[in-house]
Amino acid sequence: GNRGDEILTEAAAPGADFLARLTVEWEASTAGVAAAGVRHVSIRSGVVLSPTEGALARLLLPYRFFVGGPFGSGRQWLAWIHPADEVAAIRFLIEHPQASGPFNLCAPQPLTNAEFGRVLGRVLGRPSWLPVPAFALRLALGEVASTVLEGQRAIPQKLLDLGFRFRFPDAESALRDLLGRPRT
């Protein structure tokens, strides 16, 4: 859940927002598996970046028309991950029998929404200046708006402790790869 600038590892207590409640219920539903002595892993995925669907795809259009910007204040944290790292991390967890319990699948370098917007603008050669007001997001998305207005500063601590290496640990390298925009 939203805890401002607090770094949230897998050991952090859950929040009380929509996404936190959903995660608690989802993970509780697997308690029987663990009680039976079967290894299980719960994946707490960050926003998986894709230029063709999901959050990134929706962000691209306003940036391409020079009207991109942060959601609300822009101070909320964004836990994100490149799809190649998401797949590699899942495979890593399958192949490492000592892995069990919850794992944050997100890049080790989270950004605020405003910082992510500036990086996206830089990669696209576009400004990041026009914020989307929080009230408009709440009106359009209802309770789900909390997922973009509150965010989490999540860190994949357990994954890092097991030795997983991210191919795209920072947003700029991830976005350049996904959008076909190599550094010039």
Residue ranges of predicted features:
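Catalytic helix-loop patch of NAD(P)-dependent Rossmann-fold dehydrogenases
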Residues: 2-42
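Glycine/proline-rich active-site loop of Rossmann-fold NAD(P)-dependent oxidoreductases
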Residues: 4, 23-24, 36-38, 49-58, ...
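Alpha-helical substrate-binding/gating segment
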Residues: 31, 60-69, 75-111
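Alpha-helical membrane-targeting segments
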Residues: 58-80, 122-151
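Non-catalytic, hydrophobic alpha-helical segments
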Residues: 86, 90, 105, 116, ...
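Mid/C-terminal beta-alpha module of Rossmann-like enzyme folds, strongest
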Residues: 96-143, 176-184
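C-terminal amphipathic/interface module of NAD(P)-dependent oxidoreductases
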Residues: 146-184
